Amino acid sequence: MINSPPIGYLPGMRTMWRGAISFGLVNIGVRLYAATADHDYQFHQVHRQDHGRIHHKRVCEECGREIDYDDIVKGYETSDGELVVLDSQDLRKLPIRTDRAIDLLECVPAEQVDPTYFQKTYYLEPEKSARRPYVLLREALRRTDLLAVVKITMRQRETLATIRPAGDVLVLHTMLWPDEIRRPDFDFLTDDAGDTEVSKQEIDMATSLVENMTEDFDPTEFTDDYQRALAELIDAKTKGTKPPRKRPEPADEGEVVDLMGALERSVDQARTSRTSRRKTTASASRRRSSSNREKTGSRDKTRKRA
């Protein structure tokens, strides 16, 4: 089963879609919320000279006038150059069955779904009257370790998606259609050159390297170094101090000629790094345990004095 992400409060969560999951003859009323929010800094485009904000106007190339959103429709140009115009009324009349429903089509093993298909992630919240059937679907998927494959229409577009349990909620992942996935077309897949041949000994050594780099996945161990450096730069600009110095780039060792030798050195480095990480983790664990004991002892002394 796919590991569940940590679920917490996301500021500004708002309903993005409202409808029902069609689960056999049972309808489960739900609301859809974006499960993610990027932490990137939001920049404005400004004029270098006077720092005035830059605005982009919607201008018609035919009449040269600025156009309001209400006067903008969609246009599709056919292969022979004809322009087919569609407005919101045309799109609303499309005979789409899943307009206000999440149509559950089938349930499949998670390992059969290639992650390449996944797009965005959403939380599903049950309507108050649908909590029991919501929990039933959640527990059924959890017990069978399956993903529900569904169709949903969002922003006037029908989308394939999957639903899975994550903690106490159901999570929906929108997906690409098969014809939206590009096939890799690389020369090395078809060339007859021998530069893709590897020996059993090299595969064994590469496997050893992978095994020595294997850990339990904890996303909190990783940091966005770019955003941290950007925060330091903005802070320095605000205070009028020197910006942080750029970290030196790692030395480029050039093309690897002795692949086996490079693998052996990599395995040694991975073992050393793994031992160091374990010592650091154990030390941090001991500090937390010691801190907890001190807090407990302090509370006990306080209770005794009381």
Swiss-Prot record:
Residues 291-300 have a biased composition (Basic and acidic residues). Disulfide bonds: none annotated. It comes from the Bacteria. InterPro entries: Ku70/Ku80_beta-barrel_dom, Prok_Ku, SPOC-like_C_dom_sf. Residues 233-306 are annotated as: Disordered. Keywords: DNA damage, DNA recombination, DNA repair, DNA-binding. With LigD forms a non-homologous end joining (NHEJ) DNA repair enzyme, which repairs dsDNA breaks with reduced fidelity. Binds linear dsDNA with 5'- and 3'- overhangs but not closed circular dsDNA nor ssDNA. Recruits and stimulates the ligase activity of LigD. Belongs to the prokaryotic Ku family. This is Non-homologous end joining protein Ku 2. It comes from Saccharopolyspora erythraea (strain ATCC 11635 / DSM 40517 / JCM 4748 / NBRC 13426 / NCIMB 8594 / NRRL 2338). The lineage of its organism: Bacteria, Bacillati, Actinomycetota, Actinomycetes, Pseudonocardiales.
